[in-house]
Every structure is written in structure tokens, then in C-alpha cells.
């Protein structure tokens, strides 16, 4: 889990735009971030399988 300090640091405006990076709004994870949903792949998969993200359905072909 991300520490509170790292989450707060990510929420602050960076001095330079290239220093800004995205963190999951649910758990604070910095990797596997999905911009459209503002969360990491792990939280996205969990919430999508529970049906808590509107408009997301499981793909099958």
C-alpha cells in the first residue's frame, strides 16, 4: 500500500508538469493506472466484476 505521504505528494501540484504522475484514487497504487477511470487495474477489475462501474461489461467472444 502507498503511504499517506506519497498520496498527498501526488495530489499536490508539481513544480514542473513532467514530475506529475497518476495514482489510483482507491488504493494509491502508482502502476497499472487507467486514465479513463482514475484507478489502477486491480481496483478496476474488482469493482467491474462487482458491477459498481456503470457501463462496463465483461467481454466474451
UniProtKB/Swiss-Prot annotation:
Binds 16S rRNA, required for the assembly of 30S particles and may also be responsible for determining the conformation of the 16S rRNA at the A site. HAMAP family: Ribosomal_uS14_2_B. It comes from Treponema denticola (strain ATCC 35405 / DSM 14222 / CIP 103919 / JCM 8153 / KCTC 15104). Keywords: Metal-binding, Ribonucleoprotein, Ribosomal protein, RNA-binding, rRNA-binding, Zinc. This is Small ribosomal subunit protein uS14. The gene is rpsZ. Gene3D superfamilies: 30s Ribosomal Protein S14, Chain N. Zn(2+) binds at residues 24, 27, 40, 43. One of its GO terms (molecular function) is zinc ion binding. Belongs to the universal ribosomal protein uS14 family. Zinc-binding uS14 subfamily. PANTHER family: 30S RIBOSOMAL PROTEIN S14 (PTHR19836), SMALL RIBOSOMAL SUBUNIT PROTEIN US14M (PTHR19836:SF19). Part of the 30S ribosomal subunit. Contacts proteins S3 and S10. Its cofactor is Zn(2+). It comes from the Bacteria. GO terms for biological process: translation. GO terms for cellular component: cytoplasm; small ribosomal subunit. Binds 1 zinc ion per subunit.
